[in-house]
C-alpha cells in the first residue's frame, strides 16, 4: 500500500483543515479495529456472575454508539452514513478482546469509526469493572484492516 509523504489534515500554510472529499467517488469501504483490555483473574471470574447485567454487552453497545458519533469527537473527521457497525467483546485468556467493524458507501474511509468503536468499548469495559480492580490496562487499540478508497486495501495480518 502506498504511503503518503505529508499529513492530510493541514492546508498549505500549516493550519488544521478538513480534507475536501467532494470530488471523490462514493465507494464501499470497510474497516476493522481491535483493542485488548487486560483483566485480573478476579475480574474475569466476576464477569459471568454479575447480578446487575453483562458489562461486556454494555461495552458492545457503547462501541456501536461511539462509531455513530465519531465525527463529533474527532475534529477533522467527516460525518459518514454508516451502513453497518458490529462490535464483539470476547473473554479470552487474561482479558477481553474487542473487535469493531464499520462499513459505509461514501467518499472517505471508516477507519476512525472502527477505531473509536474499539476504544470506547474498551473504556466501557474499564468503567464497568473498575470497582473490582484499578490495575486494568487497555492495550493495542489498532487498525486491523480496511478496504476501499484510493490508498487500497490494508491488512495487519492474522488477529
Task: Annotate each predicted stretch with a short phrase.
Residues 2-78, 83-159:
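C-terminal binding/interaction regions
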